[in-house]
Amino acid sequence: MSMRHKVGTIAGTMAVSLAFIPGTASAHSLSFNQKAAAYVKQFVGRVPYVYGGSSPSGFDCSGLTSYVYRHYGKSIPRTADAQFRRFHRESEGRAWGGDLVFFHVNSNPNSYVTHVGVYEGGHHMVAATHPGGGIRWQTIYSSNVTFGTITH
């Protein structure tokens, strides 16, 4: 067996093995996260905030997240709090771009969720902010947040 074949076999075995370790992502889920994180950016500065909005003519926060996820075949609830109740919780250190950031009314991580955005990594997110604010790429401005995933 040539050295090139041995290295390829070892690398292939490692890649296959990682797909079955809990807490690691499959190629499919990583691909979804990357796509969702990239897709949501097209709305930044181009789409207004509309309370109850769930289309590119105007979004509210949970309308934006549900629209992005639905674009890739992932059906999630329509409201921020209902989305939070459906997602698996992660620490920011384990969250990936494309996961969601949930904002709570207080420091209790089980408290009601009032806002949601798409995590972009590096303590940043894309979210529908408020009337007049539209869709923005912004720093996560609160410590009362939980990160959530349905993909890994």
Model segments located where?
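Catalytic cysteine-centered active-site loop
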Residues: 42-97
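...with weaker cross-activation on analogous glycine-rich loops/strands in unrelated enzymes
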Residues: 74-135
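Structural signal for the C-terminal ends of transmembrane alpha-helices
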Residues: 19-21
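General helical secondary-structure elements
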Residues: 1-2, 81
